[in-house]
């Protein structure tokens, strides 16, 4: 495994790998190594760890900007921000345990590379929206930078968005700059019990569209709710409010009056644990034999898909987040089906993306892990890859063909 400690070493490594005709499998914390397609073909693949780029380069709390190496653990980032009453608004999840890894080993670089975001993404935006700039080495071994360290900077602004979510297929990051924001003083969750997915989606949409500054909304079937919420045995529709205590109290009272249904309040302690568990997909961690899927759709379509899955696969585990726009699913093995449920699920998803988050390697080798792109978009993606990495040295198989 190669572990360069600076951009010059990384540049030399990329150039020598290109000359060898080999490829580099990028990672930092290695918590997400089983997400995506495994390496393919006879081409040699060398492991490239960016864990050596793990320093805090600049933190300017008053400017709401943090610059660090991509190998810095997310746990260290969160601890640093908590000291100044700040956080990353897109709520980075910890998916390591989904892959049998210890909690807390994920890095900021891995989080940005996979564009991971938690339940608050529906209102706060994605990881891509909080990435301001980066330094990197491209597939030619050239050192370059894009974006900057100020929130209003626009120079090279599109490149940070392109790199975020590229799964290390375009560049090898050496430095990242992200936007941080003040953390809320407190949190409250309104729980609406015993609703079906369709009515839950309607009320989540009402809450998210209200003037009460709702932060996130999710629907949990009874099988999921009872494992996460003490004393609950029915389905739970959850609406999160955050901010100053007096504001949260006033908004909670107003929203409860507007919704016109039975509402229970969970309190700050339960709320913090609950929303972290949903962001981390914690209810699926122990389902080791199931294939895990994450489906992004228009919020109005999530309930129907979840109900269709529940009807056809009664042993499946799943819930709605992002106000109905995100579906988490765990599918047990199905007789005569070797694709982890890909054909079944993608047949249900007409306007969205179904991503195979976890499956055995044989399934990830045979099935598109990521939603297949339309031909024109796939051609654009190939041109983008060629412009950054003409020799396909970085994670050439990670996103598929």
Which residues does each predicted region cover?
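General beta-strand structural signal in soluble alpha/beta enzymes
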Residues: 2-4, 24-28, 48-49, 68-70, ...
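Glycine-rich N-terminal segment of FAD-binding domains in flavoprotein oxidoreductases
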Residues: 2-95
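Structural signature of FAD isoalloxazine-binding scaffolds in flavoprotein oxidoreductases
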Residues: 33-54, 69, 120-140, 172-175, ...
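Conserved glycine-rich FAD pyrophosphate-binding loop
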Residues: 37-43, 49-51, 98-99, 262-401
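Short, conserved charged micro-motifs
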Residues: 75-77, 197-202, 245-253, 301-308, ...
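Hydrophobic alpha-helical hairpins/lids featuring a short glycine-rich hinge
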Residues: 95-125, 129, 135
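C-terminal substrate-binding/cap subdomain adjacent to the FAD-binding core in PCMH-type
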Residues: 132-289
């Amino acid at each position: 495994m190669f572990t360069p400690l600076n951009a010059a070493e990384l540049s030399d490594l990329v150039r020598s790998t290109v000359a060898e005709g080999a490829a580099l499998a990028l990672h930092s914390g290695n918590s997400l190594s089983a997400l995506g397609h495994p390496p393919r073909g006879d081409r040699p693949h060398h492991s490239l760890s960016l864990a050596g780029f793990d320093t805090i380069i600049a933190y300017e709390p008053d400017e709401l900007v943090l610059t660090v190496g991509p190998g810095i653990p997310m746990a260290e980032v969160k601890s640093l921000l908590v000291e100044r009453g700040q956080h990353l608004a897109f709520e980075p999840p910890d998916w390591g345990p989904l892959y049998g890894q210890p909690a807390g080993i994920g890095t900021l670089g891995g989080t940005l590379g996979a564009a991971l975001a938690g339940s608050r993404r529906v209102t706060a935006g994605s990881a891509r929206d909080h990435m301001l700039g980066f330094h990197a080495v491209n597939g030619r071994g050239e050192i370059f930078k894009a974006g900057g360290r100020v929130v209003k900077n626009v120079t090279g602004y599109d490149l940070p968005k392109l790199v975020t979510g590229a799964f290390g297929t375009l560049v090898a990051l050496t430095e990242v700059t992200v936007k941080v924001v003040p953390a809320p003083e407190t949190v409250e969750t309104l729980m609406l019990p015993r609703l079906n997915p369709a009515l839950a989606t309607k009320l989540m949409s009402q809450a998210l569209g209200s003037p009460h500054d709702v932060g996130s909304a999710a629907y949990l079937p009874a099988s999921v709710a009872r494992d996460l919420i003490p004393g609950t045995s029915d389905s739970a529709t959850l609406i999160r409010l955050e901010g100053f205590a007096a504001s949260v109290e006033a908004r909670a009272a107003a929203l409860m009056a507007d919704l016109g249904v039975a509402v229970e309040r969970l309190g700050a302690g339960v709320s913090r644990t609950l929303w972290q568990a949903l962001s981390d997909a914690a209810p699926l961690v122990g389902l080791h034999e199931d294939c895990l899927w994450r489906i992004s759709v228009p919020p109005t379509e999530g309930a129907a898909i979840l109900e269709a899955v529940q009807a056809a696969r009664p042993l499946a585990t799943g819930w709605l987040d992002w106000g109905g726009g995100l579906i988490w699913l765990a599918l047990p093995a199905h007789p005569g089906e070797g694709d982890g449920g890909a054909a079944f699920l993608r047949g249900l998803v007409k306007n969205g993306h179904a991503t195979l988050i976890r499956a055995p390697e044989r399934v990830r080798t045979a099935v598109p892990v990521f939603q297949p792109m339309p031909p024109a978009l796939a051609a654009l993606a190939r041109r983008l890859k060629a412009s950054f990495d003409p020799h396909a040295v970085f994670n050439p198989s990670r996103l598929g063909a």
